[in-house]
Amino acid sequence: MEGASRHGLATARATLDEATAIPPGAAVTSVDASRVADDLRAVADLLHREPTVRRALTDPGAPPAARTELAARLLGRQLDAVSLRIVQTAVSSRWSRPADLQFALLELSVEALLVEAERDGALEEVEDELFRFARILGQNPQLALALTDPAAPASVKNALLGRLLSGRAHPVTLRLAQQAAADRIHGDVERRLADFSRIAAARRGRVVAVVRTAVPLTDEVIARLGAAISRYFGRQIQLQVDLDPELLGGVVVKVGDEVVDGSVLRRLAAARRALLR
């Protein structure tokens, strides 16, 4: 997302965090974060299906108040009050592209489910389970295809995920895996799960670097690599290491949108391009 959209996402996220926070002196909150997650995902799906609605709710020529009023008219009867407030906050912002609004609502639906994990003290557990399950899908193309197949009913995918994860992973992990499989916008379940893991890491105040390497790394090498990457980016970085033999050697490091490619595969490709000039 570009500048305006990033600001819109941050503003809507602040509304989500404020609405789902446990009040001082209270042990619980009455806000159903799971319902909020379902609502936000439903609105994102609506915007994906209805480009006219998406354009109307992001129209920079319309005053913010007009866009929030339109959201209330269209969605007020279907959404929880907290969900509607988050959507109205989002549509009152400017967006670099109309599609960024639906992407932001999808991300916020993930964060709402992660609030459930936070309340359960299981955010780190969910983050790790999401990352590991994404890697499992990467190593099992047939399983990934079964979960991505647009012709397969959601009930079939949910049942498959239930057999794989129920009793083995936190309930929020299962919900997020089901959400990734149901995502009509992005489609790639493995990538979405990795994205969800990074969102969980961000909620824990951590920045994650995904490191792809051709060979397994020892703990000592991982520690040295982590220190070097932290120095490079000027902040503390947590590594998630992924084996990828196709790289042939070296490593590829991805932090957010920035990629540092030190793989043998990249160097061979560069040499090949030089020979063809």
Swiss-Prot record:
Disulphide bridges: none
Superkingdom: Bacteria
UniProt cross-references to SUPFAM superfamilies, sorted A to Z: N-terminal domain of the delta subunit of the F1F0-ATP synthase (SSF47928)
Pfam family, one: OSCP
Keyword set includes Lipid metabolism: no
Cross-referenced InterPro entries: ATP_synth_OSCP/delta_N_sf (IPR026015), ATPase_OSCP/d_CS (IPR020781), ATPase_OSCP/dsu (IPR000711)
UniProt-recorded Gene Ontology molecular function terms: proton-transporting ATP synthase activity, rotational mechanism
Topology term for the membrane: Peripheral membrane protein
GO-annotated cellular components: plasma membrane; proton-transporting ATP synthase complex
PANTHER family, sorted: ATP SYNTHASE DELTA CHAIN
Quaternary structure and partners: F-type ATPases have 2 components, F(1) - the catalytic core - and F(0) - the membrane proton channel. F(1) has five subunits: alpha(3), beta(3), gamma(1), delta(1), epsilon(1). F(0) has three main subunits: a(1), b(2) and c(10-14). The alpha and beta chains form an alternating ring which encloses part of the gamma chain. F(1) is attached to F(0) by a central stalk formed by the gamma and epsilon chains, while a peripheral stalk is formed by the delta and b chains.
Function per UniProt: F(1)F(0) ATP synthase produces ATP from ADP in the presence of a proton or sodium gradient. F-type ATPases consist of two structural domains, F(1) containing the extramembraneous catalytic core and F(0) containing the membrane proton channel, linked together by a central stalk and a peripheral stalk. During catalysis, ATP synthesis in the catalytic domain of F(1) is coupled via a rotary mechanism of the central stalk subunits to proton translocation.
Family: Belongs to the ATPase delta chain family.
Protein name: ATP synthase subunit delta
Annotated source species: Frankia alni (strain DSM 45986 / CECT 9034 / ACN14a)
Lineage of origin: Bacteria, Bacillati, Actinomycetota, Actinomycetes, Frankiales
Gene name linked to the record: atpH
